[in-house]
Amino acid sequence: MSVDGSLPLFPLHTTLVPGAAVGLRVFERRYLDLVRDSGRSGEGFGVCLILDGQDVGAPATPAAYGVQVRIEDFDVGADGVLQLRLRGTRRFHVERTRVRDNGLVVADVRWCDEDPDDELRPQHALLATVLGHIIEQAGEAYAPANPALLDQASWVGWRLAELLPLSEQQRLQLLQMDDPHQRLQQLLGWMP
């Protein structure tokens, strides 16, 4: 299997999906260096769910799938800790990892194909309705939502993966799926 490139990882106790945002406090030297280097290179870094270990201290074992992120915003809190707002962009599969001397995990990755711009299928229309209600309830708290995308299978699936009260393992399962319709079918299967 071919490797598309190398990507430094920031393992977290959350599964980020494409288009979703997460806030992050960065205080460990290895991750401060990662953010600095990422800003200089413009290449971003990857976020993966932690399967074993913690997000501080010894290097954690990351899941085999993750998303590349871009830094949307940053600030330094009153406590002097760097605060980032990250947004997931494209999915990747980790082929192998190595740990640098400073404890930073770097992965050789294979990029997953972008989702097609398929329209929502009739059997998944309920999911778009559910998402519409969730977005309506969230109001301004979910400003990135664009109701015009409620007819696109990929967008509906990723937004539901982001907003529904799923376990991190369920989100990871969705992240591993290449077909947006399969993702929607799985979400439908999890509905009560």
Task: Kindly label every feature range from the protein language model.
Residues 1-192:
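N-terminal low-complexity, acidic/polar interaction/targeting segments
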